[in-house]
């Protein structure tokens, strides 16, 4: 009975060593699991960005309103006979806003 017990104990030690330190053991599983979580977070950010870009493409393909809005905001374009007014905040309000942004 002693040899069987010794054999089973040796088998148990070998299995535990393989589980903890061997190839595809607990340490490898933990590392791969961390990599998967990080990749899923990156994928979620990229999916949100892609969804935003697809929505913008749909807006631009959908009609003239989106193109007109983009031209007005980004290029400061106006229609013929239209006057463009830019409202500039007071210097004190600009200083307050700059102070809040620096915090």
Swiss-Prot record:
Residue ranges, Periplasmic side: 22-103
Species of provenance: Salmonella arizonae (strain ATCC BAA-731 / CDC346-86 / RSK2980)
Pfam families in the cross-refs: DivIC (PF04977)
Membrane topology qualifier: Single-pass type II membrane protein
Protein name, as recorded: Cell division protein FtsB
Cell wall biogenesis/degradation listed as a keyword: no
Top-level taxonomy: Bacteria, Pseudomonadati, Pseudomonadota, Gammaproteobacteria, Enterobacterales
Gene Ontology CC: cell division site; cell septum; plasma membrane
Cytoplasmic-side segments: 1-3
Keywords recorded for this protein, A-Z: Cell cycle, Cell division, Cell inner membrane, Cell membrane, Coiled coil, Membrane, Transmembrane, Transmembrane helix
